[in-house]
């Protein structure tokens, strides 16, 4: 009966059913003992029947023999009831010990799950913080780089404007030359504007690339975390099954041996 405990479709292994089953065992042994050897109660009766042929046996002696047989029956019943109670108590103690072992295993499993979960969350938080720091460093680097480029372009533009003013003052009498220089300056300004526009577009594109890379990193980290959690769950389930099988083996060995 105990070998099927915990399996699907197995018999009920509750303490009440086990006590009921074990209480039935001494009765069966007592019955088999009766089949191999005649009970002691019948022996006095047979002796009494054998001696009954003596016609000198008095009525008081017959009463004494009957009282002895009744006392023997009472002691036999009390002894068998005591054996049943002792076996039931031992089984109850074994069941309580088995339940205590299961509770200890469950507590140990709970502690391991909490420890693995805390370690996984700590590792994931560290990865996220590292990604965030990397993103901030890249953004700061881009800001510094393009800020310097913008500043150099603006400084160059200011220098060009200063040259244009100087040339305008010097070439007031030379309209054609001034007109040519103006046209050249406009071309230069348009080129500078194009350069600024290109730098701005490159800056926006770089920011988008950084965001895409960070999204990919977050996605990869999330998938790795899911894989780690799945492996952790599988590992915990395997350890739990092994621990439960070991507890069941110990309990069965202690009950059988």
From Swiss-Prot:
Instruction: Quote the biased-composition stretches of kind Basic and acidic residues, using this chain's numbering.
Output: 43-58
Question: Which residues lie within the region annotated Disordered?
Answer: 23-66
Name positions with the PTM Phosphothreonine.
221
Outline the segment boundaries, as ranges, of region: Interaction with DNA: 74-79, 109-112
Superkingdom of the source? Answer: Eukaryota
GO biological process terms, semicolon-separated: cell division; cellular response to leukemia inhibitory factor; chiasma assembly; female meiosis chromosome segregation; female meiosis sister chromatid cohesion; homologous chromosome pairing at meiosis; lateral element assembly; meiotic cell cycle
Record's comment on post-translational modification: Phosphorylated.
| Keywords per UniProt | Cell cycle, Cell division, Centromere, Chromosome, Coiled coil, DNA-binding, Meiosis, Nucleus, Phosphoprotein
Q: Does the keyword Isomerase apply?
A: no
List where in the cell it is found: Nucleus; Chromosome; Chromosome, Centromere
Q: Name one GO molecular function term.
A: DNA binding
Write out the tissue specificity statement of the associated record.
Detected in spermatocytes and testis (at protein level). Testis-specific.
Modification Phosphoserine, positions: 14, 58, 60, 80
Coiled-coil parts of chain: 87-244
Motif Nuclear localization signal location, chain numbering: 109-112
Similarity comment text for this entry: Belongs to the XLR/SYCP3 family.
Question: How is the subunit organization of this protein annotated in UniProt?
Answer: Component of the lateral elements of synaptonemal complexes. Homotetramer; the tetrameric helix bundles assemble end to end into long homopolimeric fibers (in vitro). Homooligomer that assembles into fibers; the fibers exhibit a transversal striation with a periodicity of about 20 nm (in vitro). Interacts with SYCP2. Forms a complex with EWSR1, PRDM9, REC8 and SYCP1; complex formation is dependent of phosphorylated form of REC8 and requires PRDM9 bound to hotspot DNA; EWSR1 joins PRDM9 with the chromosomal axis through REC8.
User: Which PANTHER family does the entry mention?
Assistant: SYNAPTONEMAL COMPLEX PROTEIN 3, XLR/SCP3/FAM9
Which protein, by its recorded name, is this? Synaptonemal complex protein 3
């Amino acid at each position: 009966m105990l070998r099927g405990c915990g399996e699907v479709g197995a018999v009920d292994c509750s303490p009440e059913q086990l006590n009921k089953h074990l209480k039935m065992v001494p009765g069966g042994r007592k019955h088999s003992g009766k089949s191999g050897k005649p009970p002691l109660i019948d022996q006095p009766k047979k002796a009494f029947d054998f001696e009954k042929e003596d016609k000198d046996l008095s009525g008081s002696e017959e009463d004494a023999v009957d009282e002895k047989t009744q006392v023997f029956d009472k002691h036999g019943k009390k002894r068998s009831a005591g054996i049943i109670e002792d076996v039931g108590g031992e089984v109850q103690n074994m069941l309580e010990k088995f339940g205590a072992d299961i509770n200890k295993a469950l507590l140990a499993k709970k502690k391991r799950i909490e420890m693995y979960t805390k370690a996984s969350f700590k590792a994931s938080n560290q990865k996220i913080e590292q990604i965030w720091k990397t993103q901030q460093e890249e953004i700061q680097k881009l800001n510094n780089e393009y800020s310097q480029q913008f500043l150099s372009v603006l400084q160059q533009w200011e220098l060009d404007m200063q040259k244009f003013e100087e040339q305008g003052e010097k070439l007031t009498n030379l309209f054609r030359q001034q007109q040519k220089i103006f046209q050249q300056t406009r071309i230069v300004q348009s080129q500078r504007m194009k350069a600024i526009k290109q730098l701005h577009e490159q800056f926006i594109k770089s920011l988008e690339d950084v965001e895409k890379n960070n999204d990919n990193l977050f996605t990869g980290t999330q998938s790795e975390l899911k894989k780690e959690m799945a492996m952790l769950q599988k590992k915990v389930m395997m350890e739990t099954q092994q621990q439960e099988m070991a507890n069941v083996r110990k309990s069965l060995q202690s009950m059988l041996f």
